[in-house]
Amino acid sequence: MYTGRFAPSPTGLLHIGSLLTAAASYADARSNGGKWLVRMEDLDPPREMPGAASHILHTLEAFGFEWDGEVAYQSRRYALYEETLCRLKTAGLVYPCHCSRKDWQAAARRGADGFVYNGRCRHPGQRPAPQGKQPAWRIRVPDRDIGFSDGIVGGYAQNLARDIGDFVLLRADGYWAYQLAVVADDAEQGVTHIVRGQDLLVSTPRQIYLQQCLGVPTPQYAHLPLLTNAQGQKWSKQTLAPALDLNRREQLLRQVFRYLNLPEAPETDRPAELLDWAVAHWDMDKVPKHAVTPP
């Protein structure tokens, strides 16, 4: 059975880009007779906005979204992540890293998603472990392409050794890394289809590699076009995208429907009816492949 999900981070309130992702993932799930889960990706408490998680859920309800089951909170799933890391340790796929970011980035080159880790701690005994310092844990990556066929973008691949380097699964400060948590959660929740923004396209080969290492199924991916401002920057909390105005719910839903190339919806003042209409007219093949700049 199709199982999709929407996974916001409570570092801020939902904005127009969040609404586009929620609407597209919801329409794709419901049009395929599937489930739509909501998962709160609250892995990084220092970056979270107080009250944002409850506000996000209230906003989704106000826009007519109905999710299946209980909301999952990553902050309550640390035992799952610990068990997942233990499996990788047992398989000999991970190693402790005592490098500070400043330490290794000084001699590193840029790759597909920031600096490529240079492997300073990859081989046991290569560097003495500092006393009293907790390490990060990294996974060894292969020198080969990891590719997949995206439902919107098409073919996409990375050579993880060249483009990314061995990446962190557990940070030295004790916080779990996004890549491990999202793979563990998707597998445990039975997620089969992931519809999300193209800013996460670059993360997907890492997640597929982790899925291969853990022997869990790889979902089908579809990465949505980003909404960008006049400067070409993604609409986000960092670029000061305004929070969704609950007094303009119908107008905002119609706006994201246009960005997704849905036909014009009939007049109604009920957001849930607009979502039902989007489900009935959903066509992934018509979703734009490239960024959209709202007028």
UniProtKB/Swiss-Prot annotation:
Motif ('KMSKS' region): 234-238
Alphabetized SUPFAM superfamilies for the sequence: Nucleotidylyl transferase
Pfam families: tRNA-synt_1c
Binding site for Zn(2+): 97, 99, 117, 121
Location of the motif 'HIGH' region: 8-18
Protein's UniProt keywords contain Zinc: yes
Positions with a binding annotation for ATP: 237
Class of this enzyme: ligase
InterPro entries linked to this entry: Glu-Q_tRNA(Asp)_Synthase, Glu/Gln-tRNA-synth, Glu/Gln-tRNA-synth_Ib_cat-dom, GluQ/Sye, Rossmann-like_a/b/a_fold
Residues given in the record as L-glutamate binding sites: 5-9, 41, 178, 196
Gene3D superfamilies per record: HUPs
Enzyme Commission identifier(s): 6.1.1.-
Single GO cellular component term: cytosol
GO molecular function, one term: ATP binding
Highest taxon in the source lineage: Bacteria
Cofactor annotation comment: Binds 1 zinc ion per subunit.
Keywords: Aminoacyl-tRNA synthetase, ATP-binding, Ligase, Metal-binding, Nucleotide-binding, Zinc
GO BP, sorted A to Z: glutamyl-tRNA aminoacylation; tRNA modification
Family matches, as HAMAP family: Glu_Q_tRNA_synth (MF_01428)
Similarity annotation: Belongs to the class-I aminoacyl-tRNA synthetase family. GluQ subfamily.
Name of the protein: Glutamyl-Q tRNA(Asp) synthetase
